[in-house]
Amino acid sequence: MRKITFIAYALLFAFTSSLFANEVNIFSARHYDSDVQLYEKFTAKTGIKVNVISGKSGALEKRIKEEGADSKADLYITADAGRLGAFQANLQGGLASDTIKSAVPSNFRTSKWVGIAKRARIVYFAPERVSGAELAGLTYESLADPKWKGRLVIRASNNIYNQSLVASLIKNNGKGKISDWSKGMVSNMARAPKGNDRAQILAVAAGEADIAVANTYYLALMLSGKKGPEQQAAAKKVKPFFPNQD
């Protein structure tokens, strides 16, 4: 497989030698006009043409791996550092940009990738059914507390956001404790996991659950009205809570 750089907009970014050529090929799972504007400014400043191949992360990764050494990808932008594993052996190393190093804290970069954005994975609650006392001192770990039995919704465990959350909990608490924690989480679920992050927020708004775990980005997206008036109205019925703040 061709050596590529890996970018996750939640956590990754890096340059290859292609940036010293006349064009650079970016495989991107992002879909924002602001990115296009950045590419245009980059081309205007450097004279380097930016070719963007857009798609969902899974499809882009499949294409890159199938094309192997023939892949044209120079940079890959995706949604989570957890996706790094699929390309670990094929990433371009040697990131040497002093500008990047000064702008990005060391815990959000390596020699092969660097973060360009972050999203918080937090708890959403129904204010009419969840009291302030219940939320006091809430942590990700305490979501396994039996008091939340039948009240929690979260998307499936094969979701990369959940996998990264669990990885961080294992790092901080150890595999044994988080194995027990995961069983408690399952016991507390109001329903079998289904749907995306917005579906979890919708479930709380509809009274199917009292709390949900989802990324902050999705509440803002729903509140913006871009996903329709129904989701906008639902988003106004829930409140965000940031765990592990003590």
Regions found by a protein language model. Name each.
Residues 25, 122-124, 239:
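Residues embedded in well-ordered beta-strands
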